[in-house]
Amino acid sequence: MKKSFTLIELLIVCTIFSFFSVGIFSFFISQVHLQTQTLMLQQAFSELSFALDKMSREIRMAKKDDIEYKKVTKNCSGDLEGTDKLNFWPIPDGISFRDYENRCHKFFLQNNQIFEEAQPDIPALPLTSTSTLIIQNLRFNLTGESQNDGKQPKVTILIDAKIKGKYEMPLKVQTTISQADIDFEY
């Protein structure tokens, strides 16, 4: 008599093999989705990191407005009342200050992007793109911005963003920068 498999044994083996195949296929599909999500998150953090580094570097090197620096007196605040000899002053959805190259520098939110402008040399240029990241809110909290408050100037940057696309995830980033120059009265 020949030994062989019965129909029930073959069906059981095929069913077990099907379950393993579906499980392995599902695992690989989930890993592809996870990798896509991770790459989008890395791109978003890369953009936010670049924008924060750029803003931090410029804000750290800010100079007081309306004082002589490099033999030039610059008035970046315009005719705003109470802005004499300030380090920073708020603008709608942003911050403005005099930078170390005697330019009037601004960082602001426009069309869900962070923009930088340094007059007269640099027109408004985006620091973030809208292809992977949507900036929902950009806030600058100022401390010690006036000359006579006895505090070292500090700026806290708060960014609310979300990753654009299939895997929308909210991101909140905060950092605080103090001015490099010691704050004393002129």
Mark where each language-model region is:
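Short linear sequence signals and composition-biased patches located at protein termini or domain-edge surfaces
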Residues: 124, 131-186
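Aliphatic-rich helix starts adjacent to a transmembrane/signal segment
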Residues: 2-56, 60
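A generic fold-level signal
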Residues: 2, 47, 89-90, 152
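Type IV pilin-like appendage domain
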Residues: 68-148
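Short, hydrophobic secondary-structure boundary micro-motifs
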Residues: 20, 67-68
